[in-house]
């Protein structure tokens, strides 16, 4: 078996790359290599599409292929190879001639700056593909976004100068902003604008199903299929913000949230008396104590688990819930800091409905600073930084949070400022769009740039969706971003030097020291 090379996620071995027989994420070397071949086939398809005429099916395969290779999505060689075969068939149908696939080994062997910039583009494309995939499921597409996937994939397989690649890195961020807007319109169009809601963490007695991932469409279908069946539904990890959407929260059997961040699933799912449905990442290697209760759908796949196909007939999940029966009595659970409830639903419209009050509180000195503390969570012990940082923030500051990094702080009671909770959960990782819109609206209200606001972004990253969001922030020219718990292994010293000089990108350090530095800079 050929050894792997992968350095796309934050937990990559030694912060240099996983290069043995398996990755830290649990992905085996053969799976990693097949995924590299899949990306190479996508580049071949992009070459054919740029010379020929892509169809909506071509667009769909590009998104599916990229999404399949995101960290903690697919561990199944069979489905990866099936996806590659579909892509090869489409390439032959689309392109006017013969178009070679790309060997990703050439990218890994490239000069470090070219490798770094192309990796930023590739990993950004993977994250953006996930957002476009979800929007597509709700009937929303954008021809300009679709066209960019072909342009950027073709560029990864071509000879490009560092300057050309840097421009494409920032364009990836620009197009991802449009893609997040597309998904925002899809979600709010289908389910309404999120509203603030308190979500319990206790699991009620009786049959239940846990739904993990990001796909609100899958959750809606499951809610419909379980209505009146005596089965409660609980969100997990990035599905938590679903509770804020009016068209989802109206279901009385959408009861609460199960557990904390994705990285704790192996202990939290141990002997769980209920099935778990993974609609997207993050799926960890499944342990025997619950393996018969894990179901996958869409691009998620794991050997020997039951997969729900495109027909979205969740009958096997429902039958398993009834068979397991759930807990015999109410089962109290807590957040990472001991809280028994969390809040969500503070997307842009909910927050900006209080814009006049927020502006007044800033001018009166009652709000001194805004923080965005969020992003991906993970297993590294150093991620306690984000909990400690949030706990140390002064009482005259507001915290926006989003993505699964919220679990480091979302069950804390930090009080409120004239009725506004000090912790405001904006939603899933793609709801960085909401946070951006909030920041832009505040900047307009104060007649300044976003960089002149009393606002600091303290971000955690893990997988490729965080990469595309970071590229969007760079495209927007946002400075003074703190990023951790480590810097990406795929960012070369020269590229990092550029980011530090141009954007003052700063690695997280000691939370107390960082906080003092931020507040003293005002």
Residue ranges and their predicted role:
Residues 2-31, 35-36, 43-44, 171-522:
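Anaerobic metallocofactor- and corrinoid-dependent redox/one-carbon enzyme cores
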């Amino acid at each position: 078996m050929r050894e792997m090379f992968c350095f796309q996620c934050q937990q990559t071995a030694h912060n240099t790359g996983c290069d043995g027989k398996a990755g830290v994420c649990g992905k085996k070397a053969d799976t990693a290599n097949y995924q590299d071949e899949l990306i190479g086939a996508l580049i071949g398809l992009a070459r054919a599409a740029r010379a020929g005429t892509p169809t909506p099916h071509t667009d769909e395969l590009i998104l599916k292929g990229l999404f399949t290779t995101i960290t903690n999505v697919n561990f199944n060689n069979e489905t990866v190879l099936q996806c590659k075969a579909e892509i090869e068939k489409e390439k032959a149908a689309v392109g006017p001639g013969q178009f070679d696939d790309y060997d990703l080994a050439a990218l890994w062997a490239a000069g470090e700056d070219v490798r770094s910039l192309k990796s930023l583009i590739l990993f950004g494309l993977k994250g953006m593909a996930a957002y476009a995939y979800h929007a597509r499921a709700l009937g929303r597409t954008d021809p300009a976004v679709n066209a960019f996937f072909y342009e950027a994939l073709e560029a990864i397989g071509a000879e490009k100068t560092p300057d050309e690649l840097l421009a494409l890195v920032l364009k990836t961020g620009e197009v991802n902003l449009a893609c997040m807007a597309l998904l925002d319109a899809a979600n709010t169009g289908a389910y309404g604008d999120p509203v603030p809601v308190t979500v319990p963490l206790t699991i009620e007695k009786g049959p239940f199903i846990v739904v993990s991932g990001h796909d609100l469409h899958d959750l809606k279908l499951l809610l419909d299929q379980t209505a009146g069946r005596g089965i409660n539904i609980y969100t997990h990890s990035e599905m938590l913000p679903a509770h804020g959407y009016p068209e989802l929260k109206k279901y009385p059997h959408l009861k609460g949230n199960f557990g904390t961040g994705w990285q704790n699933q192996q202990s939290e799912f141990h002997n769980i008396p209920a099935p778990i449905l993974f609609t997207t990442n993050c799926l960890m290697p499944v342990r025997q104590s619950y393996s018969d209760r894990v179901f996958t759908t869409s691009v998620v796949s794991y050997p020997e688990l039951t997969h729900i196909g495109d027909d979205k007939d969740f009958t096997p999940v429902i039958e398993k819930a009834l068979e397991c029966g759930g807990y015999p009595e109410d089962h109290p659970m807590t957040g990472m800091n001991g809280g028994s409830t969390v809040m969500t639903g503070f997307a842009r419209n909910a927050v900006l409905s209080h814009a006049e009050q927020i502006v007044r509180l800033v001018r009166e000195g009652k709000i001194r600073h805004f923080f965005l503390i969020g992003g991906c969570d993970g297993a590294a012990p150093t991620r306690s930084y984000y909990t400690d940082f949030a706990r140390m923030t002064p009482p005259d500051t507001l915290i926006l949070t989003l993505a699964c990094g919220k679990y480091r702080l979302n069950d804390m009671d930090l009080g409120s400022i004239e009725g506004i909770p000090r912790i405001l959960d904006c939603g899933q990782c793609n709801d960085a769009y909401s946070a951006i819109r909030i920041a832009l609206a505040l900047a307009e209200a104060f007649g300044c740039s976003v960089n002149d606001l009393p606002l600091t972004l303290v971000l955690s990253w893990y997988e490729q969706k965080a990469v595309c969001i970071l590229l969007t922030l760079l495209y927007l020219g946002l400075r003074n971003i703190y990023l951790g718990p480590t810097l990406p292994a795929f960012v070369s010293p020269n590229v990092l030097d550029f980011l530090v000089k141009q954007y003052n990108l700063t690695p997280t350090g000691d939370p107390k020291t960082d906080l003092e530095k931020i507040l003293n800079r005002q």
